[in-house]
């Protein structure tokens, strides 16, 4: 990028910011496209390494956070549906940016306490459960919790109970 393309802030060129922002925008658009055309539930990019996921719920994010937390640090995520539980895991993982088709109001409240940049198509009062008869169980379980750390403990217990039933 030539200097004529740079923005100056107190006589400092900030070309890198422009280049980085352009790269992130382009990468996020690619992730969103992959999310929708590949039939994935979640797509994550960290420094050019892209992973795709197909499980419903928070299991994939929980596994990443507890087994490979470095992959979430600074990552870009495109996801179809994000409730408060997923939001907590993303915040604790230190993601940089999220695009989601649908986000719950409770998730947005939690994101507002973080540095995560969030773009979405639709904000809804809550996330439905799988058969659309009520709230998602993770959304219900997390609804009154204020901290991402407390939500992590709730999710850990929830996933352990599911695993023990199998």
Feature annotation, model-predicted:
Residues 24-45, 50, 144-166:
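N-terminal charge/polar-biased segments
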Residues 102-107:
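Short, polar loop motifs at secondary-structure junctions
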Residues 1-7:
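Short, small-residue-biased leader/transition segments that mark boundaries at the very start
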Residues 108-165:
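C-terminal binding/interaction regions
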Residues 28-101, 123, 128-137:
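Conserved mixed alpha/beta catalytic, RNA-binding, or beta-rich assembly cores of soluble enzyme
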């Amino acid at each position: 990028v030539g200097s004529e393309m740079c923005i100056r802030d107190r006589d400092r060129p900030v070309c890198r910011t422009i280049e980085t922002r352009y790269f992130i925008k382009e990468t996020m658009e690619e992730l969103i496209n992959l999310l929708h055309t590949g039939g994935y539930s979640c797509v994550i990019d960290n420094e050019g390494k892209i992973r795709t996921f197909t499980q419903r719920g928070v299991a994939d994010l929980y596994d990443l956070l507890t087994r490979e937390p470095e992959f979430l640090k600074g990552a870009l995520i495109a996801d179809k549906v994000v409730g408060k539980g997923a939001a907590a895991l993303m915040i604790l993982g230190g993601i940089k940016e999220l695009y989601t088709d649908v986000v719950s109001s409770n998730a947005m409240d939690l994101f507002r306490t973080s540095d995560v940049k969030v773009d979405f198509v639709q904000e809804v009062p809550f996330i439905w459960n799988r058969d659309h008869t009520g709230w998602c169980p993770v959304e219900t379980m997390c609804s009154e919790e204020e901290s991402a750390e407390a939500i992590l403990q709730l999710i850990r217990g929830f996933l352990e109970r599911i695993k023990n039933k199998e």
